[in-house]
From Swiss-Prot:
Family per record: Belongs to the Orn/Lys/Arg decarboxylase class-II family. SpeA subfamily.
PROSITE patterns: ODR_DC_2_1, ODR_DC_2_2
GO biological process terms held by the UniProt record: arginine catabolic process; putrescine biosynthetic process from arginine; spermidine biosynthetic process
Species in which this protein is naturally found: Neisseria meningitidis serogroup A / serotype 4A (strain DSM 15465 / Z2491)
Protein name: Biosynthetic arginine decarboxylase
Gene Ontology MF terms in the entry: arginine decarboxylase activity; metal ion binding
Signal sequence interval, chain numbering: none
Pathway: Amine and polyamine biosynthesis; agmatine biosynthesis; agmatine from L-arginine: step 1/1
Chain segments annotated as transmembrane: none
Amino acid sequence: MPILTIREVCNINHWGIGYYDVDDSGEIIVRPNPSQHNQIVSLQKLTEAVQQKHQARLPVLFCFPQILEHRLRDINRAFQTAREECGYKGGYCLVYPIKVNQHRRVIESLMSSGQPHGLEAGSKAELMAVLAHAGTRQTLIVCNGYKDREYIRFALMGEKLGHQVYLVIEKLSEIQMVLEEAEKLGIKPRLGVRARLASQGSGKWQSSGGEKSKFGLSASQVLQLVDILKQKNRLDCLQLLHFHLGSQLGNIRDVATGVHESARFYVELHKLGVNIRCFDVGGGLGVDYEGNRTQSDCSVNYSLNEYAATVVWGISQACLEHGLPHPTIITESGRGITAHHAVLVANVIGVERYKPRRLDAPSPEAPRVLHSMWETWTDISASREKRSLRSWIHEGQFDLADVHNQYNVGLLSLAQRAWAEQLYLNICHEVGELFNEKHRSHRTIIDELQERFADKLYVNFSLFQSLPDAWGIDQLFPVCPITGLNEPIARRAVLLDITCDSDGTIDHYIDGDGIAGTMPMPDYPEEEPPLLGFFMVGAYQEILGNMHNLFGDTATADVVVGEDGQFTVIDYDEGNTVADMLEYVYQDPKELMKRYREQIEHSDLPASQAMSFLKELEAGLNGYTYLEDE
């Protein structure tokens, strides 16, 4: 059976969708425009350059605004093609929900891209940002989320400023406030209604859709809303129908089912005299984190073109059947826009690797359990084909449990316990070499042994800050070394962050057609492990990241790549300092320095050492929150 390379099992050809690839030297390259083959940069060389020019300290988050622009073009193009093929006469507007990533660099990159799109806000603070970035050109703005009068007034101000602002009614109590505030401003509001569907997608985010969804109106509440607007002579204000099946939909059938049900709402609202002009299908466009094209939680079984065709065809069929006008289709595809544009590069600060040790046989007077373990060990070499491979491991497990029990009651010494534990590892390692992946019955125990003997890589990052979804909902992200991908798989590894939390580990890794509990790695010197890349972290991760152990935002570099492969760092941020993080929890750095000074003055340190300590403490407050030792 041929030995696979890292490139072959990390699926970069699939999840990278052209933005990320591997060059002939085995380094990961970034290509912001997949059709421009010379517009590439090596992630390793980029990291080295930023470290040299900006004295950047790892970890660094690299962001590629050109990928954002290309994602806009791709999604717009997919819906343009779908509309042409269906003969769809309505328009299309891609709306960016800024909750996915509210960073200024993201919104400004989208607004300056030249690609048509709108913006969505889900809170008062987000609306304030949206109104500012919308600028002087007319922008379609969708206002979701729960609203108070101030939120509503700001939205109506946006309409007065020339934007096309839709206030989506999430609960019935909002409509009265909207009508009252609109009257005060002398403006006719554009209203939308979020319908709560029975349909919902499957996966980690399914609760955001369906009948038990936090948001939206039930069928009876939609009818009540129509009645209220009729009574107020404002039925013509209701122009947008919105629904949401859930984020990261893995199965295209869920998309088709949801569009079909929501199209029925469109038809019925028209029968009630409501002239719906915009059909907002919400989010749901998934990205393939696994690169497997399956309907699992972190993958999708469809392409972007299939998604667009499914949405457009579902709406057009309802319009054709009932002779209704084609509405403008809106999608809120935030994950599809932003996920690929950001990659975190981090260094490994330590490696813990299993090394077989030669052990001497127990002395004749040693306890029986130690002799039993030794007999198992010698039996492996003497009779490999005569017994079940599992039986040797099971016997070792039983004996080791007995060793621990005897140690706990004082019958064995610490040295004897250490000998037994090492011998058990030797037994497992030796037997593990005899298992065959071709035998289905062996696969489970092979996985278990791979996890037991995997290298432990201590990575200079916080899982809670940089990949919170990996911790919170077990989401899988592509992660692999950024060099050596053309080399054969020689080792297995598990990744641990530097927080003081046992949850700070990555448990799932891409492994060809499946998911494994260990990460395939090339051979590498223990004292010089490769840099690691954490990919597709551009959606939600920066915003959801938390301050566990006061690890802060990483350094960030915004990079533009030229057609000749030359790159420019257009913006660089050093990330949070220790002082920044302490201020978040109301620790005043000046007060801390004062207290350091008081302690040093009351100590018996020599003057030179006292001054040195004070300078080091001050430098520590102004330093990076991550480990800085080279």
